[in-house]
Amino acid sequence: MTTGDLVNIHPTELKFPFELKKQSSCSMQLTNKTTTQCVAFKVKTTNPRKYCVRPNTGVVLPGDSCNVTVTMQAQKEAPLDMQCKDKFLVQTVVVSDGTTSKEVLAEMFNKEAGRVIEDFKLRVVYIPANPPSPVPEGSEEGNSPMASLNDIASQSASLFDDVSRTFEETSEKSSEAWSMISKLTEEKTSATQQSQKLRLELEMLRKETSKKQSGGHSLLLMLLVGLLGCVIGYLLNRI
């Protein structure tokens, strides 16, 4: 806790859980230590484009507290060794009773004669978003190789399951392909047989038609021969 004559500020450092491409927030609390005076505050930072402070100005009533939320914008790169040089400055000054947050102006924090301004500097600290799990006190070094073997066995089992699943999926697809090929082969064989059957029926029909035509010519020839015989017989009788 940072303590002055007018306010207490907690915490003394702004700790942000750091994770790439994600926003992160933390808060600080300002408590008015006085019992009779209103205190105005203003929060500034060395990197205003990187942080958003809500509220960045305000008035704290006697004995009251105010929470300030600081949001760090999503970062594309991690700083070297997770060290941050950004800092925040909290300025406080006594204001008259009835002063509202909208009436807090930058000129109020100018250090003029007779005006007491308290400054508090807070540094920024990055902490891992997901800190490593602590090792139980009862664990021994001799157990670590066994744990590693268990991890390897678990990874191997998982890999085997993935390979088996992939093989089964491939086998199912192969079975479907062979079934489709077999079906197409049967359809092709059936179509060939139908074609041969139609060809035989057409050949038989052609032969029957040819026979009928031959029979018709023979009958006509016999009629002509008979008629010719009658004519010749008639002529012979006349002679």
UniProtKB/Swiss-Prot annotation:
Subcellular location: Endoplasmic reticulum membrane
Gene Ontology terms: cellular component: endoplasmic reticulum; endoplasmic reticulum membrane
Chief location bin: endoplasmic reticulum
Modified-residue entries (N-acetylthreonine), positions: T2
PROSITE patterns: MSP
Residues that bear N-acetylmethionine: M1
Disulfide feature: none
PTM annotation (Phosphoserine): residues: S133, S164
Residues in compartment: Cytoplasmic: 2-215
Domain MSP positions: 6-127
Keyword Phosphoprotein attached: yes
Pfam families given in the database record: Motile_Sperm
Family the entry assigns: Belongs to the VAMP-associated protein (VAP) (TC 9.B.17) family.
Described purpose of this protein according to its UniProt entry: May play a role in vesicle trafficking.
Name of the protein: Vesicle-associated protein 1-3
